[in-house]
Structure formats: C-alpha cells, structure tokens
A protein has these predicted regions:
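Active-site metal-binding loops of divalent metal-dependent hydrolases
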Residues: 36-42, 73, 160, 272, ...
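Active-site glycine- and acidic-residue-rich loops that bind
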Residues: 42-48, 133-141, 244-248, 401-408, ...
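Thiamine diphosphate
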Residues: 1-35, 203-432, 443, 492, ...
C-alpha cells in the first residue's frame, strides 16, 4: 500500500482507554481501519462499551474501527466477570451496543485434547488443529475488517484460555514476578515447549516486516501531520473595564467560531453547555443526535458530542487532538476527575510524539465557588492540584483567566500551541472585567499581570490570585487595607507554568518544547512586597511557583478547604474563610 494509508492498533484493556483512540482515528480518517484490542477483564462492566454505544448512535456512518475482544476468562488478578457467559450471551451483548456483525472464534471448537472448561489452550492442539484455529482467526479477522470498512459495524472475538503458550495459565499469566527468570524451571520449560525452528522464526519476522505495507512510521496515518482547516481571525470582543460579563459565554463565542471554520472540530460535553452559560456553542454548532429538534439545538450532523460519561467526553476530544484534529472538552469541574487519567495519557503521548499535533484543550466551569448546591457532589476543585502537579511535566498548562477578556486571550493562545495539554478554569457568572485585551494577553503569555496597585501607602501587601470569582473578596480587602494606610498590589496569576524557574520543569524533554519562563526582574516587580498572600478559589497547588520564588519575608495562602451546601457564592466563600474581612485580617497580622 501507499504510505500513510493505515490506521494504528490501540489497546483498551480494563483501563478502558484504547477505544477512544480507535473512534477518534476512524472519525478523522474515513476509509482507514482502526482496530482496538480489548481484554475481557472489564467486559462485565459498562466502561468500554458504554462509550462505543454513544459513538455508534452519534456517528452511525463511522464504522471503520474494529474492536478485537480477547476473551480469555480472566482479568488481571481474578476471573473475568463475564467468564460464565455463553457465546450467545457475549454476541448479544455486543449486538445490543450496535455491533450487528459479530465474528466469534472459539478455540474449544478446535480442541482435540479433551481440555476441561470453557476456555482452552490452542497451543496444546495437534499441529493440524492449531493451523485450523489460526486459519479461522485470520479468516474472521479479514471478514470483520471488510465489514467495518464497508459500513457494517463489526467486532472480532477470539476466545481461548489466558496464558496460552506462556509460563502460567489464567490470571497468573498476567504478570512476570521477580521469581519468573530464565533460571526458573517453569519459564525455561515454557520456552522449550514453544520453541520454533530458525525457518519458522524467519517467517514470523517476514510477516511482521510486511504487515501493514511497511514500517508504521511510514504507513500509519497517525504518524503524519493532519492538514487542518485554516482558521480566520477569531471574533475576539474587547469588553470595557468594570463592565460585567460572563467569562464562559465569551469563551463560547470563540469556540463556536472555530467550529464554523473547521468542520472536523468537535466539542465534547456531558450534557451541560447551556447550564454552563455556553448555549451559544450549541446554538452555533448543534448537539449531535439522530433526532432533529431545534428546541434543543440538536441535529444528526452536529459538532457537539454529548455523552453523559465524562470519560467518553474527554476520551474522544483527547484522541482527536492526539491524532491531529482540533477539539475542546467542556466539563463541570465536579466530575472531571473521572476523565482526567486519559488526558494525562494523551499529554504524556504528546510529549513523546514525533510530529506536531494541536494541543488538547479543555475548559472547566460551574466551579466550586458558584456551585453552592450539593457540596458533596458538585464542589471538587481539588482536581486543580492534579493539573498543578502536571505543570512540572513540561507540556501541561492550567490557565486561570481573571475575566471575560482574558479567557478569550487564553483560548486564542491555546489554539496557537502544539503538543500541550491546556486546562482553562473559569466561571459562568457575570463578573467585572479587570483587564484590557492587551493586558489579558500579557498575563497569559508571561504568566501573570498586575490588575491593581495603590498609588500610595506604607507597607505593601501583594495578593497573588488565580481565577476570576476569587477576586471579588480580594478587591474588597484592598479597600480595607488601603483605609488602614497600606499599599496593595493585586496580581492575576493566569498561567502559573510560566512562573516556574526553568529547572523546575522538564520542558526540554518534550516535543515542541517551551522554555518561556518569567525572569527574576519581571517576577520581582510583580510579587515583591512586605507581605504576599496567595488567594485561590480552588486548592493551593497552582500557586506553588509564586511561593517558591517570592522574596516576601511573610507569606501565606488562603485557599479552598471543602464543599458545603450553600445558597450563594458568598456563603461558600465565607465557609472557606475566603472573605474580604478574613483577607484583610490575615494581611494585618502578617504585617504586625
């Protein structure tokens, strides 16, 4: 085959991630097959097939991904939960999730050694039966592939005992432990039992060499940069300072513009854009659903993909970005933790990728401070500490825009980057605009920007603040401190990754490396003072670079503690001691 016409094989296993990449690849590359191997360890759970069911419903014409279920009766350390299923049950399970063409090859049907149990070891068959079983697998694979590439959704299921041909059988075959060395009898016996002649090994090598038409680096479409639709100048709208605007809505307008310019662009969200003040996205790009309904902005050709499973939302968006497409995942912060591991998988892969690919972008709204209800389910800003820890990876950037202007600057900046993971955290409530567009862009590019500084005063109190809503009590505290004769500087920490020292971050180890860090002179101009107080509506992790570098002799942090059911943002801030009075008192004590 010609170069760049093959898909890439991916693995789902119990981790339940591989299917997202297969679906993303199939969506970006019609006519190219994307197989994905899946172990049966998770098949008794809804994890893997749940996401595929939603995809099959949303994209009924995209069939060019092929799940390959390795049904061997065991998980990692126990029997698989579907170990007792019959072949008919397993076939029905897949058909119930939209896979009408089930190709199931059961090794037991070829067994001539009278093995016990539903799962048998094909490597102990006679040579003729081994060839027959192998031939059946190859024939089923070819048929399944042809179906998948011709618009008929298919799955290939290979059923045989786990550990066939290796050192142990069942779940015990899953891992190699310290005792499993070449000196161990069970290892050496296994190698002798399955030894091949030199000619047979050469045949294996030849098959691998020729598979797919050549080396994957030359033939796999995912090894090449995907040509993207050009984007026009974004319709950035500069709001006047002190004007009250909704950051999420301002962001949504830019997302809508990107989708209108790029037909392959996909927005993923767990059915909550409108509740997050981003109805403008649904209105412009439409929710993808087989039922046309203008009341809900839904159409079969929509660009807004809305499974309720956050893992499926993040999975498709991350897979599209990794494979070269544009996407954005929009989430309630409260349930995002269910999906973040696949984002970490993708950002790690992007760090090692041999080509450029658009950065993975996500935005979290309905944050803890404004989601007062159900404190035990809807207030989980602790995930921001996860983002903060990943800043040291070298290619992960949590962004904390301070207003509706800066969130536009944040997305504008993100769209111009490659091989990075970018999480934007913002509010869905009307909040004061505190930056010009020039200041907003400066804060994102350099890492921080001054929002306010007293014209006069005695000792200086610096507030280093992440986010937008947390600024409300900070500006109130400023009035109290100025009345007491102090000078106050309020700094928006918008892109804390840029505030680290170069040696703090593994930036030089990643693809598309970024060594832009704020120098000491600019940092000190922002954060020097008699007292520095870090303030955040979330956890304290994102403020680490400021606390590491500040020369202020007295410093403190006022951050999120825990959620509680309240009626207003002010009440939840008071519950967490994030009030103007508390901030002014803390500063006064530090000054004393």
């Amino acid at each position: 085959p010609d170069a760049a016409d093959e898909g890439i094989g991916v693995i789902a296993r119990q981790a339940g991630q591989g299917q997202h990449f297969a679906m993303a690849g199939a969506l970006l590359h019609p006519g190219v097959l994307f197989p994905v191997t899946i172990g049966d360890g998770g098949m008794g759970e809804p994890y893997v097939l749940n996401s595929m069911m939603h995809f099959n419903t949303a994209y009924p014409g995209v069939t060019n991904y092929l799940p390959v279920l390795i049904w061997n009766g065991y998980s990692q350390e126990h029997h698989a939960m579907c170990a007792t299923w019959s072949n008919d049950q397993m076939s029905a399970y897949w058909k119930g999730h939209g896979f009408d063409n089930v190709f199931l090859v059961d090794a037991r049907q070829f067994d001539d050694k009278d093995q016990e149990g539903a799962y048998v070891d094909s490597t102990v068959f006679s040579f003729d039966r081994r060839l027959a079983f192998t031939g059946a697998v190859l024939q089923a694979a070819e048929s399944a592939a042809r179906h998948a590439l011709s618009g008929r959704r298919a799955v290939l299921i290979v059923k045989q005992l786990k550990g066939a041909g290796v050192h142990k059988l069942g779940a015990k075959a899953h891992n190699l432990y310290p005792a499993d060395t070449l000196d161990a009898e069970h290892i050496s016996d296994g190698l002798k039992r399955r030894a091949l002649s030199p000619d047979a090994w050469q045949l294996v090598r030849d098959n691998f060499f020729r598979a797919g038409g050549g080396p994957a680096a030359k033939t796999a479409v995912t090894e090449h940069v995907l040509e993207l639709a050009p984007l026009p100048k974004l319709p950035v709208r500069e709001f006047a300072k002190a004007e009250s605007q909704v950051p999420a809505t301002a962001f949504g307008a830019l997302v809508a513009a990107v989708g209108q310019a790029d037909p392959r662009f996909v927005v993923t969200n767990a059915d909550g854009n409108e509740a997050s003040a981003m109805a403008n996205i649904n209105q412009a790009l439409k929710i993808r659903h087989p039922v046309e309904d203008p009341l809900y902005n839904q159409t079969p050709a929509g660009q807004v993909y809305e499974p309720l499973n956050e893992d499926a939302c993040a999975g498709l968006a991350a897979g599209l970005a990794l494979f070269g497409g544009r996407s954005v995942w929009l989430s309630y912060e409260s349930f995002a933790i269910n999906a973040w591991p696949i984002v970490q998988t993708v950002t790690q892969a992007m760090a090692e990728l041999r080509r450029k690919t658009p950065s993975f972008v996500c935005m979290f709204t309905a944050g803890a401070l404004e989601q007062g209800r159900n404190g035990w389910t809807h207030q989980r800003p602790e995930i921001e500490n996860y983002f903060a820890a990943q800043m040291r990876n070298g290619n992960v950037y949590p962004l904390f825009p301070c207003d509706a202007n800066q969130i536009q600057a944040a997305y504008e900046w993100a769209l111009g980057t490659y091989n990075k993971g970018i999480a934007i955290i913002a509010s869905k409530s009307p909040l004061p605009v505190r930056t010009s567009m020039e200041e907003a862009r400066t804060g994102i590019e350099r890492g921080a920007v001054t929002l306010y500084e007293s014209p006069a005063g005695g000792k200086t109190v610096v507030f280093a603040v992440t986010g937008d809503m947390a600024l409300l009590p900070v500006f109130e505290a400023k009035d109290k401190l100025e009345a007491a004769g102090h000078r106050v500087r309020i700094v928006s920490v918008a892109n804390p990754r840029r505030l680290y020292r170069p040696g703090d971050v593994a930036w030089e180890t990643v693809s598309e490396p970024d060594n832009a860090f704020m120098d000491d002179d600019h940092f000190n101009a922002l954060f020097d003072g008699d007292v520095l107080i870090g303030v955040t509506g979330g956890p304290s992790g994102p403020l680490e670079p400021v606390l590491l570098r500040t020369r202020a002799l007295r410093r403190d942090v006022m951050a999120w503690k825990r959620g509680e059911t309240t009626a207003t943002p002010g009440e939840i801030m008071a519950f967490n001691d994030l009030t103007a009075e508390a901030m002014a008192n803390r500063a006064s004590k530090l000054l004393a």
